[in-house]
Amino acid sequence: MPTSNELYDLAVELRDQGDKPGAVSKLEEAINLDTSFAIGHGMLAKLYADLAESDKAILHAKKVVELEPNDAFSYTALSVIYQRCGRIPEAEYAKAMAYQKQMGLE
């Protein structure tokens, strides 16, 4: 049985070949093996946004923030996902949180 990292690598290959649904499938397998696999949730957020599945994109972006609450980039990525999904107030809030994390203003 492949590991989460191996499934992630397969997902990257599929994404690079233009098979985003196939990549999503491999990433879903990866996070089912390890629900704390933040990089898998991050790529799922991006792919679901690309596939116009906003609710799933936001869910996975929020999971990254939950898993890595002190990482400014996690909030930046969440902001971008919110923006791409048309949720501007939430995007602005996540951007502000990223700034606070980056500047140590918690």
Predicted regions and their residues:
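Structural signature of tandem alpha-helical TPR/SEL1-like repeats
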Residues: 16-28, 51-63, 85-97
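Alpha-helical segment of the N-proximal tetratricopeptide repeat
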Residues: 2-33
